[in-house]
UniProtKB/Swiss-Prot annotation:
Mg(2+) binds at residues 1774-1776, 1874-1875. The gene is FAS2. It catalyses: acetyl-CoA + n malonyl-CoA + 2n NADPH + 4n H(+) = a long-chain-acyl-CoA + n CoA + n CO2 + 2n NADP(+); a fatty acyl-[ACP] + malonyl-[ACP] + H(+) = a 3-oxoacyl-[ACP] + holo-[ACP] + CO2; a (3R)-hydroxyacyl-[ACP] + NADP(+) = a 3-oxoacyl-[ACP] + NADPH + H(+). GO terms for biological process: long-chain fatty acid biosynthetic process. GO terms for molecular function: 3-oxoacyl-[acyl-carrier-protein] reductase (NADPH) activity; 3-oxoacyl-[acyl-carrier-protein] synthase activity; fatty acid synthase activity; fatty-acyl-CoA synthase activity; holo-[acyl-carrier-protein] synthase activity; magnesium ion binding. Keywords: Fatty acid biosynthesis, Fatty acid metabolism, Lipid biosynthesis, Lipid metabolism, Magnesium, Metal-binding, Multifunctional enzyme, NAD, NADP, Oxidoreductase, Phosphopantetheine, Phosphoprotein, Transferase. CDD domains: elong_cond_enzymes (cd00828), KR_fFAS_SDR_c_like (cd08950). This is Fatty acid synthase subunit alpha.
Length: 1888
């Protein structure tokens, strides 16, 4: 077992303490030390290595005080230095300024004649280039022919893509190419083409010698190859018209260079080729100037004289040249201009053209434009800029978002709730849980109930209190859902009403909060509070005394009117008098109290009880309506008004009774809005409208909501509302809308009413809630501006327009009996607040609709309900007033939370109020009594002033107190109490799987699994990695699971993208270790990286707009094509080389003329009429988005060399990085380590690709066709198997199987299948599998032509961002999103994985591929993979016992007994086989034969394990492959928790794949209500084709190890078509489960490729091994994890994650012997530590016959000898399989072994092997006694095997065994024991 972390930490602490103690306790003796090196050794240079000059300072003081005169006498000059500040002096680094030559610049040089030194910078430095001479040419230098050495040097450097300085002439070509034979052949071919014949083996000759050899026969001129390269350089990188002739002329006139020297300059230019075509002639000349200077420095030529001559000439010309007067020149050329003009006019008249037509048209247009501009200016001045900009249209039908998949969100909400309880996030049933229960009930259906029943029935209460709570709540919720199954959904809010609270702390900070109201704990009580009103809303209430007086007067009046008898009057008078007397004398009754009655009901929802959930479906009877407690002469806080004849609105008790009673019903039992169609505007986040929206969708309404800020963030907000609250039958539509635009208003209503076939919704509105508004704060009467007018338009004009449009649509459709109820947003603010522009006027003007409803003709289409909205806290308009709300309430006014006001407004939609509105307009006062508060403005100002004053006083007191405290106690008095914040540090983990305690593992898997499986037939994934749009598998996993990067994720992404790098050394003169910014070299702390880089990382990762710099400048908006054109006129001539000119002639024949240019030897080429040209053109391509690797990703960051990067296709780099990261994830830091465990032939590579090296293919076809430079070996990089070849050549050096699948988009899963088959067949034990593909414009264009990919322009039109264009399983999915990258897994058999101690991420239980049916469409999706569920059901009554793991285990036990018997028999028979063997060979014979028997027994056992463990279902028609694969590990189809979908976001695939998975589950009998969780990874990554399945498998393995199932975050609305697939759930957010047992991965590729893989949690493998094996494995994995962690972080720091191998693990001499010995293994070289093959171990017999087996052979040979003698009367042989001894069975151990035996066995390294050996000995002893057996269950405790130090095992008999031996005359029993990791063998001999 591994050492526990606590113990390690304790030991480290002790060690550190001891080291420090030793250091402090030991004397330093520094003075003596100084004397030694200063005096004894006379040291002159002292260097301190450390962070600061501590010792150096002491040494300097010592020298000055003690050795100054001593040094003077000896002439010693000492130097004391410190590494941290004197690095330059220590390393003798000169200052760059000192190296610069000191020259006296002349006047010409000071004006800019110096040439730019660097070719690469030439274009940028064009401005600084020397001006061309204006006068005579420069003096020519003596010409010199080009030298063979320069020509050779350039050709080699150019081919290697290096500068001349990087190619030393002392090296050979073979050395320079670094083993790249293809490049070497190219260079030799170029040399042959250039120089003719070449000497023998030129590649092995140093370039210096080779140049001398060439010089002997060299003619001194450029050859074919160099001329061709120069010609290509000029044509591809120089500006148009800048030909070789022009260049040579410039070099001759500017620098005085002859043709030979010009050749040399042009040759040098080949190794400094510009990256792109130069912009103009000045750039080209600057480039040539820099090349000339470079040539001068190489050849030693001085160009300054030429430069000076040119400058002098220019100066002379400028000073003494002839000049001409401008007027004279004009006079000279006047006649020429007149004649030219006359000729032009003659031609114009002939062609009937008006030369001044354009000018005339321009003047007309100018006038028109001026007139239009005048109108615009007028409108701008009149309406204002804000108004004009504000009325712009934003509505678009295409951008409408429709949310209606409540059926899916219900299951997701249930699972979220379930797992939150399981994980302890929710520990009791509070109001949040009850609210969620209501939402679930509102979505209740049969499928949902089955879903709940399954999960609750499988919730084991024994797992803890959380599971118990989940089960209890679940049962109640199920019953609730059953009860409301046929009921309509209801809006029911059970949240606690809150009130405002403003506090000012001691430091003067004003803090506002919402706190529950003490007496109002639920909405039913809230309604009561509203009905009662407050002191401010009531008139003075009568006392009891006053009421009695009124009653007395009323009775007297009645008596007088009805002639009541006097006796009755007297009796009444008497009673009344007694009552008054009683009240006067009573001390208990207060006659002055009011007669108002009120009651408060306790809140039973505050209790932690699940009973509330159980009571939810019950419709409570309201015995006493709230209206009964409305006090007389009191106006409720909420009430309805009626219109008086005076046209004023007054409180109406009867109407208010209806309203409040309806509100009470809604609060207690809820209210439904089913089949209601509602339009709501102004429902942004934090508004009243948003709360109203929640209530509407919760009640089942169909709602269209508008937003003026349409964006992904906004639509996600509304989607989250629907996902949480949307009830069955509800719909939410979100559209962009500007209520200030008339066009938008009309378009919106048209959209609502248009038929669906016309792109509309086909709705008829039942309610309109136009709440849109904008604030106008601070605008008084004299400041009414453009914004105020626009606000008025929004809040009044366009509301009227909107209502008019609704009326128009209803009338057009003849809708007269279904009026839409309009909830008008009125306000109590009738100028009361002031300073709010035209807000009050807008609200007041809406009230005219109450009259117009009667006076106009639209009462059958619209009803009016005005809502005077009171003080609502927290909204955008009132947020600033929150702090004074508490003060307002103290005055008797009731302010409202947003939820309360939303509840009030939704109460206006109840049937009672709707019916009232249909009779007459209704005015609802929801003001809370605010209208009764006079001088509101003054009062609010006073409240705010008091708060401000109190705050400022407390602030001042706080500051004064702090100053006083510091003065008294000191400035640092609080230092001890200061809060210390621990800053986070990034700690990137490799995420090795968590290994549970063995006891936990055994509980997870079936106990019968142990020993059942042949682990060599179990394939596991031990490492995985990827390179993709989100970086590595770690960073992609973070983004997929959590939707954001952690600190570690940001650090890794920043490193990947080259934003940061690691620094260790001096930085700005001080030592620094840590991250630095790659651009600025400034230090960056870990904690700051996320804040600094995250926005850049997110912008340049994932799915995004195509970045041209990543794809050879490919810009889809300017995709280049070529078109063939036949020219109709002769073209102007251009210049080309002779070779090129002849090629033109060869192609065009007589359609081209070519002539040599004598001066340069170049040719003039002229294309004639009829010649054919291919002319480039650009088109706008509509696929603008793709999943791209992070910008800045560079293989060099990982350690891949520049040579490799320049040589291979980019996809190969992705693969190399992925492979090395997969090995690191496997804990393998040196790939050669594999050969310690397997032969080189047993490591295979089965990875593949859909297209392979597309960049190479592009080079082969497109670039080669365009005659652009392309490496000659480009062909090899295009092969799909080349990537695997590079992996082997640079990393692995294996000789195992290589299989390269090509399965289009299913390649990676096909690779898995091939890899698994390769290992199972025995051809390999370790395989690299996976897939990879690139993204390039060619593939993108062709996918677009197939309409397979997402149309970016169409997506933009629909308002989608690039990140959401891949939307699998959604209603709006519209094509897949291409991506690029690689994904790799390392797989091996489980036996090897356990032995190596590599991490196991998952078991590959099933891999399969399948084709589809007859068809004519290659990409058409099919269901062939459904065959993995093929299973015959028929009418069979009984299931096959093979699926019973206990049955299979029993069969295996029987077979093990047979194998045991066979081994014993074979061992006994060896004595007969050995009879003919010479004595000297007998030992070898027994060793080899016993090894053979053991191996055969092992084979038989493994065959039996395969038969009963993992292959029992194969070819059995009753067991589907999928069912059998799961049953192997004791799992059923119900245990398949997750299905990772291919999910490409195409209409066809997502439906077909869902149907396939659903039918699989259904056919195999998956339980109803148990859907698999669907994972759709491509929403995040896009579709990388070949890598798709690999990324999905990586994600599946992460799911198994984390239990987190990622959601499809782009699934805004799941397609209704998918609702029919009841066995699939489509989550949109991640779910943290309590564990996933198995995951299915499906993949579909163009070309009839379907594939599936199932990964099972590794715990089910661990359950199949014994405890000792598991614990040993845990220790190995722990060690590997530490080593891998260290290697990974060192690799990041030093950019050495990838270290390519320079040599194979064997020498050339050992290559063939290693290949031919399957038992050859590597070992560590004693000198270098490298893992290499040693010749001594090859073909060694010790590799075959193990040392353990030799002991067995000795025992068996001794047995043969003893049985051949006469002294042996009894012999017993027993063989036991190690695994067959169950050491965990305490009963078995205690019954058969003595305490001494048990103690001995438990001390041994392998406890199970020791027990097995002892048991074998006991059995052998029993057999040797020759007595009758007492049965298989008899105890063997009486036979004791003792062991003494230095002695072998001895037999001690007790009890019955001793008696039996005595009866059989046995005097002594000897026994020998041998065991290995497979079996134990014991031989016992009884002596008589």
């Amino acid at each position: 077992m591994a050492m526990k972390p606590e113990v390690e930490q304790e030991l480290a602490h002790v060690l550190l303490t001891e080291l420090l103690a030793y250091q402090f306790a030991s004397p330093v003796r520094w003075i003596e030390t100084q004397d030694v090196f200063l005096k004894d050794f006379n040291t002159e240079r002292v260097v301190e290595i450390g962070p600061s000059p501590t010792l150096a300072g002491m040494a300097q003081r010592t020298i000055k005080n003690k050795y100054e005169s001593y040094d003077a006498a000896l002439s010693l000059q000492r130097q004391v230095l410190c590494y941290s500040k004197d690095a330059k002096e220590i390393y003798y680094t000169p200052d760059p300024a000192d190296l610069a030559p000191v020259e006296e610049p002349n006047a010409e040089e000071q004006t800019g004649a110096a040439a730019t030194p660097a070719a690469a910078a030439a274009p940028a430095a064009a401005a600084a280039a020397p001006a061309a001479p204006a006068a005579r040419p420069v003096a020519e230098l003596p010409d010199e022919a080009v030298k063979a050495s320069l020509l050779l040097h350039v050709l080699v450097a150019q081919k290697l893509k290096k500068s001349l300085e990087q190619v030393p002439m002392s090296k050979t070509i073979k050395d320079l190419v670094g083993g790249k034979s293809t490049v070497q052949n190219e260079i030799l071919g170029d040399l042959g083409k250039e120089f003719g014949s070449t000497p023998e083996k030129p590649e092995e000759t140093p370039l210096e010698e080779l140049a001398e050899t060439f010089q002997d026969t060299f003619a001194g001129s450029l050859g074919k190859q160099s001329s061709s390269l120069i010609s290509r350089l000029m044509s591809s990188k120089m500006p148009g018209g800048f030909t070789i002739t022009v260049a040579r002329k410039y070099l001759q006139t500017r620098w005085g260079l002859g043709s030979g020297r010009q050749d040399s300059v042009l040759l040098i230019a080949l190794t400094n080729e510009p990256a792109s075509r130069l912009g103009g002639e000045a750039d080209a000349k600057s480039f040539l100037d820099s090349m000339a200077q470079k040539y001068a420095s190489i050849s030693g030529v001085d160009l300054s004289s030429a430069s000076a001559g040119a400058s002098a000439g220019a100066g002379a010309g400028g000073a003494g040249g002839a000049t001409i007067d401008a007027a004279a020149f004009e006079e000279l050329t006047k006649d020429q201009k007149v004649m030219a003009r006359q000729q032009l006019e003659v031609l114009a008249r002939y062609l009937k053209m008006d030369l001044n037509g354009g000018e005339k048209k321009f003047l007309q247009e100018k006038n028109t434009v001026a007139e239009l501009q005048s109108q615009l200016d007028y409108l701008n001045n009149e309406l204002g800029e804000y108004f004009i900009q504000g009325i712009s249209t934003s509505f678009s039908r295409k951008k409408a978002r429709v949310f209606d998949s409540s059926w899916n969100w219900a299951k997701q909400a249930l699972l979220t709730l379930y797992f939150q309880i399981i994980h302890g996030v929710l520990k009791n049933v509070d109001r949040e849980v009850v609210t969620e229960a209501i939402n679930i009930m509102n979505r209740s259906n049969e499928t949902l109930i089955k879903f709940m029943e399954y999960h609750i029935s499988h919730c084991d209460e024994n797992n803890g209190e959380n599971y118990k709570l989940a089960k209890t709540l679940g049962h109640q919720l199920i019953e609730n859902c059953k009860q409301v199954l046929d009921m309509d959904p209801v809006y029911k809010d059970i949240s606690k009403p809150t009130g405002p609270k403003t506090n000012i702390d001691k430091n003067g900070n004003i803090k506002y909060s919402e706190e529950p109201r003490a007496a109002v704990r639920k909405l039913s009580q809230y309604v009561q509070e509203m009905a009662l009103g407050g002191p401010l809303t009531k008139e003075s209430q009568p006392t009891i005394q006053e009421d009695l007086t009124r009653v007395y007067k009323a009775i007297n009046a009645q008596a007088a009117e009805h002639n009541i008898s006097d006796s009755t009057k007297l009796e009444f008078e008497k009673l009344y008098g007694e009552l008054l007397k009683f009240l006067e004398t009573s001390n208990e009754i207060d006659a002055s109290a009011t007669t108002r009655l009120a009651g408060v009901v306790d809140d039973d929802l505050d209790k932690d009880s699940t009973k509330e959930v159980a009571s939810l479906p019950n419709k409570s009877e309201i015995s006493k309506n709230v209206s009964s407690i409305i006090p007389r002469e009191t106006v409720p806080f909420l009430h309805l008004k009626k219109k008086l004849p005076s046209c004023e609105w007054a409180y109406d008790r009867q109407l208010s009774t209806l309203f409040l009673d309806g509100l009470e019903k809604a609060a207690i039992n809820g209210v439904t809005f089913k089949d209601k169609y509602v339009l709501i505007t102004g429902a942004g986040a934090g508004s009243i409208g948003a709360e109203v929206l929640q209530g509407l969708v919760q009640g089942g309404a169909k709602v269209i909501v508008t937003t003026s800020r349409f964006s992904k963030k906004v639509t996600d907000y509304y989607q989250s509302i629907y996902a949480q609250y949307g009830a069955k039958g509800s719909t939410l539509v979100v559209v962009p809308f500007n209520q200030g635009s008339k066009q938008d208003v009309e378009a919106l209503i048209d959209f609502i009413y248009d038929d669906e076939k016309n792109g509309g919704l086909g709705w008829d509105l039942d309610a309109v809630i136009p709440f849109a508004a904008i604030p106008e704060n601070g605008i008084e009467l004299d400041k009414i501006d453009s914004k105020s007018e626009f606000a008025h338009r929004i809040m009044l004009t366009n509301i009227l327009r909107m209502l008019g449009s609704v009326k128009k649509q209803k009338s057009a459709r003849g809708i007269e009996t279904r009026p839409a109820q309009v909830i008008l947003p009125l306000s109590p603010n009738h100028g009361t607040f002031g300073g709010d522009g035209m807000y009050s006027e807008s609200k007041l003007s809406l009230e005219t609709l109450f009259n117009r409803w009667h006076s106009e003709s639209w009462s059958n289409q619209l009803t009016i309900c005005g809502a005077i909205i009171g003080w609502t806290r927290g909204t955008g308009l009132m947020n600033a007033n929150n702090i004074i709300a508490e003060g307002i309430e103290k005055m008797g006014v009731r302010t409202f939370s947003q939820k309360e006001m939303a509840f009030n407004l939704l109460g206006l939609l109840i049937p009672e109020v709707v019916n009232l509105c249909q009779r007459s307009p209704v005015m609802a006062d929801l003001n809370g009594g605010l209208q009764f508060l006079t001088d509101l403005k003054e009062f609010t100002g006073k409240l705010r002033g008091e708060l401000t004053e109190t705050s400022e006083i407390r602030k001042a007191v706080s500051i004064e107190t702090a100053l006083e405290h510091k003065t008294v106690a000191g400035a640092n008095a609080d230092a001890a109490f200061a809060q210390v914040e621990v800053q986070p540090r990034a700690n990137i983990q490799l995420e090795f799987p968590t290994l549970k305690p063995y006891e936990t593992v055994k509980k997870i898997g079936s106990p019968d699994l142990e020993g059942l499986l042949d682990l060599e037939k179990v394939i596991v994934v031990t490492g995985f990695s990827e390179v993709g749009p989100w970086g590595s598998s770690r960073t992609r996993g973070e983004m997929e699971a959590f939707g954001e990067f952690s600190l570690e994720g940001c650090v890794e992404m920043s490193w990947i993208m080259g934003l940061i790098k690691y620094h260790n050394g001096n930085l700005k003169g001080r030592p620094y270790t840590g991250w630095v910014d790659s651009k600025t070299n400034e230090p960056v702390d870990d904690k700051d990286i996320k804040a600094k880089d995250e926005s850049h990382v997110l912008e340049h990762s994932g799915i995004r707009l195509i970045e041209p710099e990543l794809f050879n400048s490919y810009n889809p908006e300017k995709k280049q094509m070529i078109q063939e054109v036949v020219i109709e006129e002769d073209l102007e001539p251009f210049e080309a080389s002779k070779e090129t000119a002849e090629q033109f002639k060869h192609e065009h024949g007589d359609k081209v003329d070519i002539f040599e240019i004598p001066e340069t030897g170049e040719f003039s080429v002229r294309l004639l009429k009829g010649a054919t040209l291919y002319i480039p053109k650009a088109l706008r391509f509509d696929r603008l988005v793709a999943g791209q690797i992070p910008t800045g990703w560079n293989a060099k960051t990982y350690g891949i060399s520049d040579d490799t990067i320049s040589q291979v296709d980019p996809i190969t780099l992705f693969v190399l990085v992925s492979v090395i990261e997969a090995f690191i994830a496997s804990g393998i830091t040196d790939p050669y380590e594999m050969y310690k465990y397997v032969h080189v032939s047993e490591v295979g590579n089965c990875s593949g690709s859909g297209m392979g090296g597309v960049s190479a293919l592009r080079g082969m076809f497109k670039d080669r066709y365009k005659d652009q430079p392309v490496q000659n070996d480009i062909l090899q990089e295009s092969f799909i198997n080349t990537m695997s070849a590079w992996v082997n050549m640079l990393l692995i050096s294996s000789s195992g199987p290589i299989k390269t699948p090509v399965g289009a988009c299913a390649t990676a899963v096909e690779s898995l299948d091939i890899g698994v088959e390769t290992i199972l067949s025995g051809k390999a034990k370790i395989c690299i599998v996976g897939g990879y593909d690139d993204f390039q414009e060619e593939g993108s264009y062709e996918f677009g032509n197939m309409n397979a990919t997402s149309n970016s322009l169409d997506e933009f039109d629909h308002g989608r961002t690039p990140a959401e264009m891949s939307r699998p399983a959604t209603t709006t999915r519209n094509g897949f999103m291409e991506a690029q990258g690689a994904g790799i897994q390392v797989i091996m058999n489980a036996d090897l994985a356990l032995k190596m101690g590599v991490p196991i991420y998952g078991i590959l239980a099933l891999t399969a591929t399948a084709t589809d049916k007859i068809g004519r469409s290659v990409p058409a999706p099919g269901k062939g993979i459904l065959t993995t569920a093929r299973e015959h059901h028929g009418n069979l009554k009984f299931p096959t016992p093979l699926l019973d793991i206990k049955y299979r285990k029993r069969q295996l036990k029987n077979r093990e007994a047979q194998i045991k018997q066979w081994v014993e028999t074979e061992l006994e028979m060896l004595k007969y086989e050995a009879e003919g063997i010479p004595a000297e060979d007998q030992e070898t014979f027994y060793a080899e034969r016993t090894e053979e028997i053991k191996r055969e027994a092992t084979r038989q056992l493994k065959s039996a394990q395969a038969q009963w463990g993992s292959e029992f279902y194969k070819n059995d028609p009753r067991i589907a492959p999928l069912r059998g694969a799961l049953a192997t590990y004791g799992l059923t189809i119900d245990d398949l928790g997750v299905a990772s979908f291919h999910g490409t976001s195409t209409k066809a695939n997502d439906k077909n794949e869902s149907a396939t998975i659903n039918e699989m589950m259904k056919h195999l009998g998956r339980s109803e209500g148990n859907p698999v969780l669907g994972v759709f990874q491509k929403y995040l990554t896009g579709h990388p084709k070949g890598a798709a399945g690999a990324w999905m498998m990586n994600g599946a393995l992460q799911i198994l190890n984390s239990g987190i199932v990622p959601g499809n975050r782009n699934a805004d609305n799941v397609d209704k078509l998918l609702q029919q697939f009841e066995y699939i759930l489509y989550p949109s957010r991640s779910l943290k489960t309590d564990g996933i047992k198995a995951v299915s991965v499906t993949s579909f590729g163009f070309g009839q490729k379907g594939a599936q893989a199932v990964a099972v949690h590794p715990d089910f493998l661990y359950a199949a091994v014994d405890e000792a094996t598991y614990n040993a494995y845990v220790a190995k994995v722990t060690a590997r994890e530490k080593a891998a962690y260290k290697y990974f972080h060192n690799g990041m720091i030093h950019n050495t994650l990838f270290v390519s191998k320079e040599h194979a693990p064997y020498s050339d001499e050992l290559e063939q012997p290693v290949y031919l010995d399957p038992l050859a293994r590597v070992s560590s070289d004693k000198k270098t530590g490298a893992l290499v093959f040693n010749g001594k171990g090859i073909q060694s017999s010790s590799q075959f016959v193990s040392e353990e087996n030799r002991k067995t052979a000795t025992i068996v040979s001794e047995l043969a000898k003893k049985t051949a003698g006469t002294d042996a009367s009894g012999v017993g042989v027993d063989v036991e399989l190690i695994k067959s001894i169950n050491v965990e069975n305490d009963t078995f151990i205690e019954r058969n072994f003595t305490e001494a035996e048990i103690a001995y066995c438990k001390k041994q390294p392998s406890v199970q092997s020791s027990f097995a050996g002892t048991w074998s000995a006991k059995e052998a002893v029993f057999k040797s006694l020759g007595v009758k057996s007492q049965g298989g269950g008899a105890s063997l405790k009486d036979i004791e095997i003792t062991r003494e130090a230095g002695k072998g095992p001895e037999v001690v008999l007790h009890g019955a065994a001793k008696e039996a031996a005595t009866k059989a005359n046995v005097k002594n029993v000897k026994v020998s024991i041998s065991h290995d990791d497979f079996q134990s063998v014991a031989v016992a001999v009884s002596e008589k």
